UniProtKB/Swiss-Prot annotation:
Belongs to the TolB family. It comes from the Bacteria. It is found in: Periplasm. It holds the Pfam family TolB_N. Residues 1-21 form the signal peptide. GO terms for cellular component: periplasmic space. Keywords: Cell cycle, Cell division, Periplasm, Signal. This is Tol-Pal system protein TolB. The keyword Flavoprotein does not apply. The Tol-Pal system is composed of five core proteins: the inner membrane proteins TolA, TolQ and TolR, the periplasmic protein TolB and the outer membrane protein Pal. They form a network linking the inner and outer membranes and the peptidoglycan layer. Part of the Tol-Pal system, which plays a role in outer membrane invagination during cell division and is important for maintaining outer membrane integrity. GO terms for biological process: cell division; protein import.
Length: 433
């Protein structure tokens, strides 16, 4: 749907031939200062048991993905302590590490008891210690938990490594035979499970704030309709059946309302539905396309994409009515708005004046400056971690749709492992614990 709307917006803008908005703000190219060096030493495993995954490696990758920390490569480690008494601080000072984590794992009867400790290398003081237990099949959960605890202790920001992600894959077997699969995985693409399969497109999956329900668009009736699905049971409810476009669902912060796009009255406009009563209220009106709503934390403000000024730009408007206020001014295309957790940063799909590529960018809402976050092109569907430190987006590499993870500070850019086929439409979960 985003691709279709992008094409429609661009086409309308070209036909209109209207002058581009004045570039009032500043464009900043992405820079990258050095991340804080940290060493996550391989955890010792009692009895030499072989575990299905490397817990320390998962923790290290989590901390790296945040963009705050740069893990010391294992091949550079001078010593490999597994408990506090074995830490030789001069080894880590020689490597320039500011923090070092050690840990040990005790397997017993299909369960794991994990102990860990984190040290400040300069002060030689312990800053965090803890333990966690679970089944072998929960190894990744425990690793993400330790990374969450460590990240919050060091930064004061709640970790988002135990969250999940939704995305859609499309596998084409022949001209008229494509299988679409809605998947849920760890935020890093691991442990994907199938929530829905269809021979018709699935678009715009979105987690509810409780993390237990999702909304999405399905074409299973040969036309777009919005569904709500309960993750645990798989129970589904169709909630729209209007003529024309039914798309771009977005949950309100309290989970009681859905904003979405309908074209039943002519142009695509944004409506809000009370999920319990199914009553809808129209929010936007007038000429042009209004689409891709995203809620502010106050539950009263909607950010959205509109071409009302001649080119796709981002606006905000009260759900209760009133005029829309334009938010973006840099570039001749800004769409698909997402807000960081503190609502100081607007993440969007952006095209610079004079360029043809679409990139993920972040706008400082106080200063108005815009920073390009990605080095790919044809980017779409950015989704931001609940703590605002990372984002995932869809793009194309070597002719295939893939997902990429980027830290908002610009230090980390990496592809996520996903299933075969075209991968698109990522959506980050809220905190789940």
């Amino acid at each position: 749907m985003i691709k279709r709307l992008r094409g429609l917006l661009v086409l309308l803008c070209c036909v209109a031939g209207m002058a581009m908005a004045e570039e009032k703000n500043i464009l900043v190219t992405s820079g990258s200062d050095r991340a804080t060096p940290i060493a996550v030493v391989p955890f010792g495993v009692q009895g030499g048991s072989v575990l299905p995954e490397d817990m320390a490696d998962i923790i290290s990758n989590d901390l790296r993905n945040s963009g705050y920390y740069g893990p010391i490569p294992r091949q550079n480690m001078i010593s490999l302590p597994t408990q506090a008494s074995e830490v030789i601080f001069r080894d880590w000072k020689a490597l320039g590490a500011q923090y070092v984590m050690v840990g040990s794992i005790v397997p017993s009867g299909g369960r794991l008891q994990v102990s860990y400790a984190l040290f400040n290398v300069a002060t030689e003081q312990q800053v965090l210690t803890g333990s966690v237990a679970g089944g072998v099949d929960q190894l990744r959960d425990m690793a993400h938990y330790i990374a969450d605890q460590s990240f919050e202790k060091l930064t004061g920001i709640k970790g988002a490594f135990s969250t999940r992600m939704l995305y859609v894959t499309a596998e084409r077997f022949s001209t008229n035979n494509t299988r679409y699969t809605l998947q849920r995985s760890d935020y890093d693409g691991a442990r994907a499970v199938t929530l829905l399969q269809s021979r018709e497109p699935i678009l715009s999956p979105r987690f509810a704030p409780d993390g237990k329900r999702i909304a999405y668009v399905s074409f299973e009736q040969k036309r777009p309709r919005i569904f709500i699905q309960h993750i645990d049971t798989g129970r589904r409810e169709q909630i729209t059946n209007f003529e024309g476009l039914n798309g771009a669902p977005a949950w309100s912060p309290d989970g009681t309302r859905l904003a979405f796009v309908l074209s039943k009255d002519g142009n695509p406009d944004i409506y809000v539905m009370n999920v319990a009563s199914r009553q809808i209220t129209r929010v936007t009106a007038g000429p042009g396309i209004n689409t891709e709503p995203f809620w502010g934390k106050d539950g009263n403000t909607l950010y959205f994409t509109s071409d009302r000024g001649g080119k796709p730009q981002i606006y905000k408007q009260s759900v209760g009515g009133g005029g829309a206020e334009r938010v973006t001014f840099v570039g001749n295309y800004n769409a698909n708005p997402k807000l960081s957790a503190d609502e100081k940063t607007l993440v969007m799909i952006h095209r610079q004046q004079g360029f043809t590529n679409f990139k993920v960018a972040a706008q400082d809402l106080q200063r108005g400056s815009v920073k390009i976050l990605t080095e790919t092109s044809l980017d779409e569907s950015p989704t931001v971690a609940p703590n605002g430190t990372m984002l995932i987006y869809a793009t194309r590499q070597q002719g295939r749709g893939v997902l990429m993870l980027v830290s908002l500070n610009g230090r980390v850019r990496l592809p996520l492992p996903t299933a075969q086929g075209e991968v698109r439409e990522p959506s980050w979960s809220p905190y789940l614990n």
